C-alpha cells in the first residue's frame, strides 16, 4: 500500500509518519526511512536505496518526497523510479510519504497512492493534539473522509527523530 501524508509546515506530517513507522517497527516489521529514526527495526536509507531490487521487504518512509519526486521531476527521473513506484507490492514494500501538498508530488506516485491523509495540529499549552483525515487519493479533500482520528502528542515519538533534520536532495535519483 502507498499512503501520502500532507499538511503545511509544522502541522505534524513527519510526526504522523514517524508514529506509524514506530508502530510497525514495534510489531517486528522491518522499516526504512530517509529521516533518521531511533528504533532498532528502522534502518536509515537514502532515496537511491529505495530502488535497490535487493532491499528486503518492509515499510519505507519517504519524508518531504516532493524534494526528490516532485511534480516537475518526470523527464529528469531515472527510469528505475517508475519501475519501483509501479511495483512496490511485488517487492514486499509499503510506502508512506510526506509532502506539503499533493500537487507538489510526481503524478505517477500520486496516481499509485491508495490513501491521502491531511494532518493538522493544535497546541493547547501543555497538550498538543494531532488529527488526520483520510480519503482515497482520487477523492482527496472532497466529501466525507474515509477515516479520521486524533491523538495527543507522544514524547516517545518526539524523541525518536529530529524535527529539524533536513532532507538533502540526492542528485543520484536523476538521469
Regions found by a protein language model. Give the residues of each.
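Hydrophobic anchor at the beta1->P-loop junction of P-loop NTPases
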Residues: 5
